């Protein structure tokens, strides 16, 4: 028997059903949303090292090799592998934080290694506190901090690297405190390793600011490594005697430096010469190290009431011959590290600045200031006491300020928790807060960069909302790793942009209202304010690309096309003109990711290919008319033929500047000449023009990648140097005679030399601009020689 519902009951039940369906939909969506951070079990603030450690733990547990009976093992592992691939990469992590997985459509990944790789090869130094795994973004700052670094460049698959690992760990423990021990994974940071000239593994280099890197070529025993490291440690041990004792002590005390002295008597224990050298290196600039032979200097030791072997630290101003009144620290250990830690703990803390003197002191000098609230937390890391000495040559003083003594001052600076900041000699107006790691080398790098940069900490009182000058403002959150990675690059960019535009940072965890006003939804968000115009930066986190972005705002490389200008410039283009056009929509995440790459590509194609873009949100009906069915839609319009509307659509997977440029150049007529053995001999070797020749093989992948770059080069040097190509598969004897041992190989053949040789000069670059600059430099030198020879005749 049916049941009839009245209207009210029907509406009520319909609402219930709709609510249930909505809840079900939300559950399904949430259940399928794979948050990469939660997949790895890390927070959004996790460091690269924490992400590697979390992934390794999961990889060893979930790897398909260890779960052969689980049909879902492959799929489950792909998920965590994908999460790791994205979060380990700074740029992909930024895209993911901002757009979610939508922003990663061009970076699918999907490959993983065997279980044994993750067990034995992956992150081999991540669990060693004495060894710091350095990444590209922090490497230069670390090795230029002023500390001595010994760095192991290794590859995960290298057996010799694994053979060295146990020794490297023992060595790191042995020299801890004397120098920094680092490691670079060249499997993850290939570009960094290439930049540092690393072409074999393991490669061990010593680095110190102001000196060239020194490669270690000895045997890989711990003793040999220690001996090599000690050659580069600055250590001076003074033998004290009646003749020099008083002057040495008084001179050091006057400079605020104390003495560590070991008094040695025959048959009794005192610090060995090797231990004294190590302590001198560890305490370099902080404490002088000396020793007294009490058998030879009996009267001196007796005057100091020392009758047995003793080691003591004499702080500045210590009374040497009255132990009861003196602040002398007597040391019972013979171990260098134990003595070092005890002395460091007893060194005086940084100067405490008072509220009354703060503004005046900061106005007349550059300062690194530690802010604390009551208890001084810096005491937990006594190594930070080295800062005063290591920053002395930079003319940066180091002090501390207790915010509990003057809360108003800290509140005005937006300091609400313990932190440190650099003040640039203009009082409290110009300062920058440190958001990096609270470890010595990171703070050193920050202080040196900050005092020489032009980055301003912004707040409501100085935010450039209506400033007539252009500003680049970085909206960030201190907990966000990509934000922290961007800050050093902003400092570099600010020095290069000084006088052109100002650079500032705004902490959105403090100034939430300002960030909401500008609709900041992800961190970091970097924006250029130019009076009424606002432009958001979407590029990579590098000073170079920030500068490119600014230059593109001044001189746009991409033509913004309207339906009218599209018809005029593209459809009615001249016979020899070509265009590449990006049809996009501002709300489309892949379009937003593409835009900086599109602009970068356009700059490299200036004079060769016209580049434009069409906003399909603004000109929707026009894009529909042009049959644009997806975003972004990239089209190439070739040299005009009878088919004016002919175009080619880009279907490639990668939408980076290099891939897009190669695709576009592939449609241009060949500018280089295909050479045969006969034409190579007649035109290149016996001809009266300069030639640059690309020796290649059709099956060679790098040759195929280089081909469009060589075509670009041919166009750049047209009229001055001719460009040719030799197919080494078709003409092996020609290539063999030219001494070709690898593909591609590029050689320059210069006319007017004494005699052209088939070997000539090889060019090792694969960048068209670099090759062109090198060629022009060679030709200029050659012309000078020819002119000089003619003058002599």
Curated annotation (Swiss-Prot):
CDD domains xrefs: DnaJ, PDI_a_ERdj5_C, PDI_a_ERdj5_N
Its domain of life?
A: Eukaryota
Coiled coil regions, renumbered to chain = none
Please give the chief subcellular localization of this protein: endoplasmic reticulum
**Record has Ribonucleoprotein as a keyword:** no
Glycan-modified residues: 530
Task: Name all J domain ranges.
Answer: 35-100
**Keyword match Repeat:** yes
Disulfide connectivity for this sequence is: 158-161, 480-483, 588-591, 700-703
User: Which PANTHER family does this UniProt record tie to the protein?
Assistant: DNAJ HOMOLOG SUBFAMILY C MEMBER 10
State the protein's name.
DnaJ homolog subfamily C member 10
List the source organism.
Answer: Mus musculus (Mouse)
